[in-house]
């Protein structure tokens, strides 16, 4: 007891403070070492007619062990997918193959990781245990990419979460802005002033340091056409990426293949709608993919669809892919 009493109380007090600070530092270390980052997948206008196919932002710098949560913010489906280097891209219905279905996963570059197609309000968290630069893709949309730079904890990070929040907001605003004025572009190289024509969607692809971002307009421009019996309406898809359909009657289970159509000499598909009970479907309309070195050149894409209406009536149509976003129209046929 004598030895203990000889220790000054001030020294014991300082030692207690030091121990408390040390314990607090240990408790806070895991939070610093395993930071939680936030990003967004997709964006849309209030009407759903403009869809940003983009990771917002599409470039992040984090430390090994950190988590990133992607929150989906559009009614258009997307995936968050990290593939192995050199892996062949698979369809979004297939996944990597397979999907991580429990809302979280881990990616170290050796095994593919993908969410299933998700929509507004859903989220997915990925842990990155290994340093590296990892490409982020959406399996639904080819020109929707990003990158996550995973650094060793000894290296400083260039940005914090507030920077990414601001960048995401700026990119969202830029993509969805009316400044693009896409809806008022015209097909100057294909003059059909004497015909009834409809622009079946339009879009624009942009790029930054993280990859590609895309705006698509999921609308038929001038969707209601008034014609006379025996006349023909022509739809053209102006979008460089998105596929659309023109569908009368029952929507097919597989939207890719056309139903009750023939092919005109210029490659456009052609259907005839005699009554509201007819089922006529364009199949997917879209531009051909870009030519690539060492791969066979793809044939021209099918971008146009024509329908002749022999009889009077009202004939509603829809895009079988984006009808849920409001991509619909109507042809009114007068005698």
Where would I find each of the regions flagged by the language model?
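N-terminal secretory signal peptides that target proteins for export/translocation
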Residues: 1-13
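Extracytoplasmic copper-binding redox domains, predominantly the cupredoxin/blue-copper superfamily
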Residues: 34-335
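A detector of low-complexity, intrinsically disordered, Ser/Thr/Gly/Pro/Ala-rich segments
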Residues: 10, 15-19, 259-260
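Bacterial N-terminal signal peptides
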Residues: 16-28
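Bacterial Sec-dependent N-terminal signal peptides
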Residues: 26-36
């Amino acid at each position: 007891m004598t030895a203990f009493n000889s220790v000054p109380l001030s020294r014991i007090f300082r030692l207690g403070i030091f121990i408390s600070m040390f314990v607090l530092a240990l408790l806070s270390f895991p939070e610093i070492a395993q930071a939680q980052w936030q990003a967004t997948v997709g964006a849309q206008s209030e009407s759903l007619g403009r869809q940003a196919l983009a990771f917002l932002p599409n470039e992040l710098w984090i430390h090994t062990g950190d988590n990133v949560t992607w929150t989906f913010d559009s009614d258009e489906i997307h995936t968050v997918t990290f593939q192995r280097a050199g892996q062949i891209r698979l369809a979004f219905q297939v996944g990597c193959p397979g999907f991580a279905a429990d809302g979280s996963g881990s990616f170290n570059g050796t095994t593919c990781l993908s969410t299933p197609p998700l929509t507004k309000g859903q989220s997915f968290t990925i842990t990155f245990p290994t340093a590296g630069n990892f490409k982020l893709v959406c399996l639904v949309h080819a020109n929707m990419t990003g990158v996550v730079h995973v650094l060793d904890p000894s290296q400083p990070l260039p940005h914090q979460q507030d920077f990414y929040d601001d960048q995401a907001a700026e990119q969202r605003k830029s993509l969805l802005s009316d400044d693009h004025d896409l809806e008022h572009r015209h097909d100057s190289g294909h003059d059909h002033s004497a015909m009834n024509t409809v622009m079946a969607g339009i879009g624009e692809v942009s790029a930054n340091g993280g990859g590609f971002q895309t705006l698509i307009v999921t609308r038929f421009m001038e969707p209601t056409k008034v014609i006379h019996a025996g006349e023909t309406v022509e739809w053209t898809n102006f979008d460089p990426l998105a596929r659309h359909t023109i569908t009368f009657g029952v929507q097919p289970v597989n939207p890719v293949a056309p139903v009750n159509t023939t092919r005109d000499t210029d490659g456009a598909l052609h259907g005839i709608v005699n009554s509201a009970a007819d089922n006529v479907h364009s199949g997917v309309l879209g531009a051909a993919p870009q030519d690539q070195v060492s791969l066979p050149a793809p044939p021209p894409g099918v971008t146009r669809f024509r329908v002749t209406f022999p009889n009077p009536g009202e004939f509603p149509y829809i895009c079988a892919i984006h009808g849920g976003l409001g991509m619909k129209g109507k042809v009114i046929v007068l005698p």
